[in-house]
Curated annotation (Swiss-Prot):
Record's protein name: 3-dehydroquinate dehydratase
Residues noted as binding 3-dehydroquinate in the record, renumbered to the chain: E34, L35, R36, R64, R185, S205, Q209
Source organism of this protein record: Coxiella burnetii (strain CbuK_Q154)
InterPro entries per the UniProt record, alphabetical: Aldolase_TIM, DHquinase_I, Type-I_3-dehydroquinase
Domain of life: Bacteria
Oligomeric and partner information: Homodimer.
SUPFAM superfamilies, alphabetized: Aldolase
EC annotation from Swiss-Prot or TrEMBL: 4.2.1.10
Active site residues per record: H118 (proton donor/acceptor), K145 (schiff-base intermediate with substrate)
Length: 233
């Protein structure tokens, strides 16, 4: 049986005013948002508090470093401070990248933890992805996330294989970046993926990210086609 897709809209913005405006628009569309605070030109724990006060929906707090494909230029210690503030303020999820997971330790953990791996150059072979998955398991996260550049059909197959072979008790997000990766973004939540990400008002945070309305229309049409006809034996 196919899963009901969970769509998370990504919120970005250079200024606090722009960010809060995008957040308001996202929250009118969905019940799940990802707050990419690394896009802000300035960020501090007080701004995290302001953003939390404007957040009414389930939210992932993410402060991704430039080295991991984000915009944040601060130290791991600064990341730690921001994510710790997010935990203490009551955000539902914190996204921590695998390369810095051993440098960031959340005290008195309240939020669920997503451990992420991003590769903007290519999709590694399945053996390498499985090795990374084993490394992620050492941190005992609530959700595993893989996002890789998908340029050919083999990349799509590799990512679907990773998702389909996950343990039944594990939550996993699998995303393809680029045009070829769009099919993964659409189908992975139907095949056991924890959620998929979309954009709103053209505020895209990753290659191949699909507009929320387009994604919503796809799922509505998909379920209309796949639902059995009434009265059919």
């Amino acid at each position: 049986m196919l899963n009901t897709p969970r769509i998370c809209v990504v919120v970005i913005g250079k200024t606090l005013e722009e960010f809060l405006s995008q957040l308001e628009a996202a929250q009118t569309a969905v019940d799940f948002v990802e707050l990419r605070i690394d896009y802000l030109e300035q960020i501090n724990p007080n701004w995290v508090r302001i953003i939390k006060n404007h957040t009414q929906k389930k939210a992932i707090l993410c402060c991704r470093a430039r080295a991991d494909g984000g915009k944040f230029l601060g130290t791991p210690e600064a990341q730690q401070e921001i994510l710790q503030a997010g935990n203490d303020l009551g955000f539902d999820y914190l996204d921590i990248d695998l390369p810095v997971a051993n440098k960031i330790s959340i005290h008195e953990k309240k939020a669920k933890i997503i451990i992420s791996y991003h590769n903007f150059l290519h999709t590694p072979p399945i053996t390498e992805l499985n090795f990374l998955l084993e490394n992620m398991r050492l941190f005992n996260p609530d959700v595993f996330k893989f996002a890789t550049k998908s340029e050919q059909y083999e990349d799509v197959k590799t990512l679907f294989k990773l998702l389909i072979n996950k343990k039944n008790n594990e939550n996993m997000i699998v995303l393809g970046m680029g045009e070829q990766g769009k099919i993964i973004r659409l189908l992975s939540p139907l095949l056991g993926g924890y959620l998929t990400f979309s954009s709103i008002n053209g505020a895209i945070s990753a290659p191949g990210q699909i507009d929320f309305k387009t994604m919503q229309d796809f799922y509505q049409r998909f379920y209309k086609i796949s639902s059995p006809l009434k009265g059919e034996d």
